[in-house]
Amino acid sequence: MKVLICYFTGTGNTRLCAQFLANHFIEEKNDATLYEVEVGNDNVPNPNDYDLIGFGYPIHAFNTPEIFAGFIKKLPKAINKKYFIFKVSGEPFPPNNSSSHHIYRKLKRKGYRLIMEKHYLMPYNIIFKYKDELQKQMYLYLDPLTKVMAIRLTRGEEDKIRYNLIHTVWSFLLRIEWIAPKINALFLHNKKKLCTNCMMCVNNCPTKSLHVTKTGKIKTTSKCALCMRCSLNCPTKAIHMGIFQPWIVTGGFHYKKLAKDESNNGTYINYRTKGYFKLFRKYYLKQNELLRKYNIEIPVKYNEENQLENLKK
């Protein structure tokens, strides 16, 4: 089976998810091609040349990012072309379940048929930084969970996708978030005292909207996707994110380093988790059940008192 995986990524979590999926499809004796959606990457593979299409994106305010919705709009028509969706966010809140409804409608009109959709949790790149133990837990779960998806799709399994009306309305109303980057573009700039002019932010911007002005300032245009790539990865923390400055997360993600840290057991979400992250427990319990169903080892070791299965008692 020939699989095409098209995705947009801001700070790399969706790219990582896409790469894991591609690797697992190949393990299952399929061909897998990756295509990253960004301005200037115009060599778009034709979906009609593939047996199965994957579409992936980071959830922005319970929605598909505008740049990815624009990509979907430009796709050629097809005839009953099967596709799946994988999406990434930092929290398991129910309105995320309807984040794809907008592109689902577009794809249906073009002749594409949705057969599976999966929501993966990865660390926030905005609002606040997740603790290392939770970052490790999310990273370690991503690999086996994408393996399950690749196995299921290779076997020809399909899910019945239903979008909750209330969640869909929430998603529609919050699509106003598409306006936020355009407004915030007026205020985003570099802090000249901290900026070393390394040009990392300009060169790596997925929308190619960051640029250097005649006065030497780094500014952006209304094409900005507010993906947070520039602020997350700036080595000197020199990006001022305008209106969203109080919510920035810096320092990047270092998953491979965390994975090797034996002092970090990666079980931040467990039976005894309290506060905000208590809301994450049912998500991980459900993922454990899914992994067991497909005979895949749970990637972290919970002690008996903290295992999520205690929620059932």
Please give the residue ranges for each predicted region.
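Iron-sulfur cluster-binding cysteine motifs and their immediate structural context
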Residues: 190, 200-219, 229-247
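A mid-sequence, solvent-exposed acidic-amphipathic segment
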Residues: 168-198, 202-206
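FMN-binding flavodoxin-like domain, especially the glycine-rich phosphate-binding loop
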Residues: 3, 13-16, 24-36, 47-57, ...
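Nucleotide-activated donor-dependent transferases that construct or modify glycoconjugates
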Residues: 4-8
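Short gly/ser/thr-rich secondary-structure transition/capping motifs
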Residues: 33-40, 215
